[in-house]
Amino acid sequence: MKDFFRMRTAQQPATRHWRHTVAPGGLPLAGHALLMARKPLQFLASLPAHGDLVELRLGPRPVYLPCHPELVQQVLVNARVYDTGGPVKEKAKPILGNGLITSDWADHRRQRRLVQPAFHTARIAKYAEVMERECEAESTAWTARRPIDVSHEMLALTARVTARALFSTDMAPHAVAEIQHCLPIVVEGAYRQAIDPTGLLAKLPLAANRRFDDALARLNQLIDRMIDDYKASDDGDRGDVLSALFAAQDDETGGTMSDQEIHDQVMTLLLAGIETTASALTWAWFLLGRNPGAEAALHAEVDEVLGGRAPRYADVPRLAYTQRVFSEALRLFPPAWLFTRTTTETTELGGRRLPPASDVLISPYVLHRDPALFPRPDSFDPDRWLPERAKEVTRGSYLPFGGGSRKCIGDVFGMTEATLALAAIAGRWRMRPIPGTKIRPRPQMSLTAGPLRMIPEPR
């Protein structure tokens, strides 16, 4: 599967004249904040036509959007100079703690070394046993020709998979239900706080704030209970993520993680690993419903590889078209559609001098929809990821999992989970769109689809 992500480094000239400009449409005082609030995807996708590095104003503060993949790579591979930071990070820390997403550069390196063993290939194979069972359960639970909300079903599936991979396969059903209930509330509330420039919204006595506070407290309590239960048991390595985190030892320092550090990593993995995969799976079903040729190719591969049985981890390498379907859904609707970096020192990007504490926006959505990088960028074409075509994709232009040292640590986990889910469901059902159903991307913490009603028809 890793071969799928190997892409050719585009040949670039030794010197380049970069185009940098200020984005059009800014207003006095507000700058481009209203455009970002009202139509962020359309606005951002229009910017590559104006320059390789585009300056925006969010209120009085300038932020910089690199639109060329070479500049994006420059940011992502230099994590010391372009660190996490800015107001979004500061608002996320009380929710996520000091985990992989929110930690500063120096500490992130240590954390990455400690968490990485939990996602080694041998452990992915163990987690895949959970994926297999849950995907099979999901695919057999539906009633023929009874409409379902695909978004809801995919979120429930990925919540069960992630929770049981984190905390072991015998996790109590009520704990999984607690995660399914609390997680969407926390994600929505975190997004509201992140986009509030004043910081006042979270302090108002609103019902939404009370729901958020309650859901966050319940998630924190659940994680603490799971940690306490593990410490009180004599189970040793149960094959789950929590066991790996407790066993982790830094090769460089010999250090381990405290209970609080493990808590923060678990919270990070819950919030980063459930909604993102669920959103991408929802988009995949939406796209397949609109492209019967791709749906037929998916069914043909599943029938050939599986022969009517449920998919297994060993089948994943042979489900090549299934992987291409998901990768193309990730290109068109990347869950991590926007993230930020902040400079730690004076540096230069695209010929522009950036002082310390300059905010840089990275948008995979912008790159993925750029016709200069992807021909017919708005078309759903899974075969653009055939090996002979994928090798022509410019390095740094496809970033569904980010890049550099902060690339998503669960990328292989997510691809494996999605491949098994698509194969399990496609082996039993044709997912039919309901006529008149309209859906549009919702750019929040991830690029969600909102409710998507479809009709499962037996194959």
UniProtKB/Swiss-Prot annotation:
InterPro entries to which the protein is assigned, alphabetical: Cyt_P450, Cyt_P450_CS, Cyt_P450_E_grp-IV, Cyt_P450_sf, Cytochrome_P450_Monoox
Catalytic activity: cyclooctat-9-ene-5,7-diol + AH2 + O2 = cyclooctatin + A + H2O
Pfam family, one: p450
Binding site for heme: 408
GO molecular function: heme binding; iron ion binding; monooxygenase activity; oxidoreductase activity, acting on paired donors, with incorporation or reduction of molecular oxygen
Annotated keywords: Heme, Iron, Metal-binding, Monooxygenase, Oxidoreductase
Matching PROSITE patterns: CYTOCHROME_P450
Cysteines engaged in disulfide bonds, as pairs: none
Enzyme class (EC, first level): oxidoreductase
SUPFAM superfamilies registered for this protein in UniProt: Cytochrome P450 (SSF48264)
Known cofactor(s): heme
EC code(s) of this entry: 1.14.99.62
Keyword Disulfide bond included in the entry's annotation: no
Family to which this protein belongs: Belongs to the cytochrome P450 family.
Stated role: Involved in the biosynthesis of cyclooctatin, a potent inhibitor of lysophospholipase.
Protein name as it appears in the record: Cyclooctatin synthase
Organism field: Streptomyces melanosporofaciens
Lineage: Bacteria, Bacillati, Actinomycetota, Actinomycetes, Kitasatosporales
Gene this chain is encoded by: cotB4
